[in-house]
Amino acid sequence: AGFYVDGNTLYDANGQPFVMRGINHGHAWYKDTASTAIPAIAEQGANTIRIVLSDGGQWEKDDIDTIREVIELAEQNKMVAVVEVHDATGRDSRSDLNRAVDYWIEMKDALIGKEDTVIINIANEWYGSWDGSAWADGYIDVIPKLRDAGLTHTLMVDAAGWGQYPQSIHDYGQDVFNADPLKNTMFSIHMYEYAGGDANTVRSNIDRVIDQDLALVIGEFGHRHTDGDVDEDTILSYSEETGTGWLAWSWKGNSTEWDYLDLSEDWAGQHLTDWGNRIVHGADGLQETSKPSTVFTDDNGGHPEPPT
């Protein structure tokens, strides 16, 4: 048993609704920080960590031992691991998507058996163009390949347009969902200046997914971005109101141009930034709203057998 979606709700392996409250960590670029950063993120109250991995397309490939290590660290710290391949970011090419899918299949021995603690975010922000039809065609093609390989995990699919074109999910999400023989696919919007720029945009983008009975997470968001402000207060409050998960971007290590998105000044989380304090200690933040998956709680959600 593992995570599954039913309607617009994600459930854990014990059949309890699970609302992600977590943080992104750029593992692919800072491979030696996992043993420091992952426990530090858990200490902030995160129930989920989204882990950036590389399939070798743009950065040094993360091998199967690395995947085992980061999943184990997440589990030890009672966090669900959302694993994602970052190399296809913003790319429209089908070959980039296929490479990510081939990577998950290559790594399946580290993933199979972890369905209760791991969610597979197939490819970060694949399909940069604002074209929902071509985006959907790609995922309709590859989701069955993952299932044929024996990966039964909940799958997460980022919106087109660098994750910021939720119209792609509004128009074609149902088609992508129906392409999954297990009907265990959820969707992710990345809320920066376009998808999260003001309160009405935030609310409408969330409503138009969950009103179709599709499960949603805000897989990345910031407080501002290259071309404008982000309404992080509404992202947090409306996510809490609607039971929508969120994963803030990102723990540390953003390049100089985007270092305002660092949540912490150090990998160990001794010194949070203003952004970090907002996410951890602010209204509707981690301390207020994050609850661990029942697969990690002492009574295992009322089930006597602990997860293996």
From Swiss-Prot:
The active site is at E125 (proton donor), E220 (nucleophile). It catalyses: Random hydrolysis of (1->4)-beta-D-mannosidic linkages in mannans, galactomannans and glucomannans. Residues 284-308 are annotated as: Disordered. It holds the Pfam family Cellulase. It is an enzyme of class 3 (hydrolase). Coiled coil: none annotated. It comes from the Bacteria. SUPFAM superfamilies: (Trans)glycosidases. The keyword Hydrolase applies. GO terms for biological process: glucan catabolic process. Gene3D superfamilies: Glycosidases. This is Mannan endo-1,4-beta-mannosidase. It comes from Salipaludibacillus agaradhaerens.
